[in-house]
Amino acid sequence: MKMLNELCDVLIDYKQKNPGANFKWRGQYIFRPKHTVNEEHIKKLADSGVDYLIVGLETGSDKVRYSMNKKHTTDDAEWFLEMFKKYKIQCRLLMITGYVTEELDDHRRTLELFSRWQKFVASETITGIELGSILMILDNSPVGQQKHELEMSFVNDKPYAWHSGKNPELDMFERVRRRIETHREAIKYNWPITRSLYRLNTIKHNLLEVVELM
């Protein structure tokens, strides 16, 4: 955060010294607990030329987000969205459905976001959402390093065909069901979904492959 603020200061200073420099810039951003960030930081982003950010929200569940080691809450994220709206910064949200620790109530909290935050879609603060396909477990990823703790097994070593003994209800078929339900809820509230058909075709391919192996 310190380095980002310093970068913004340099760019703001350059713009002030060069009135014709109307450049914009974009990047990835991380939501944080709102008590660690003030409004001045968001204003500084906008004044330096930021007009679009990609942010990993991941889920509507604070519990699941914490298990990913992402320590911001949904309320924290909403504060950032309000600030983005105020300072005309657009964003695209990245999501993961069916994370290893996700229970049905967590999934419902994700679905609730689409109606709750439809106002940010209407204001074009949120310009799109990336829903992904289905979660793949890679060996060297943080969750991949917890395979034994989460009692994970795989169908034919396929990274997307996993099962967790700690969350047995979340089999592949349930993950696909939740992913499709999330997709439908996003459409219901007019959220633009990026790479929509590509992701759905990937899910279809993965599901058919697992069915053949079973």
Model-derived regions, located:
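Detector for methionine-enriched segments
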Residues: 1-3, 68, 83, 95, ...
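Conserved SAM/AdoMet-binding glycine-rich loop
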Residues: 1-92, 99
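Intrinsically disordered, low-complexity regions enriched in small/polar residues
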Residues: 16, 27, 31-33, 54, ...
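Generic preference for well-ordered secondary structure
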Residues: 29, 52, 94, 187, ...
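Noncatalytic linker/hinge segments flanking ATPase motor cores
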Residues: 32-37, 65-75, 92-100, 133-142, ...
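Repeat-solenoid scaffold signature
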Residues: 83, 89-108, 121-126
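C-terminal accessory regions of radical SAM enzymes
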Residues: 105-214
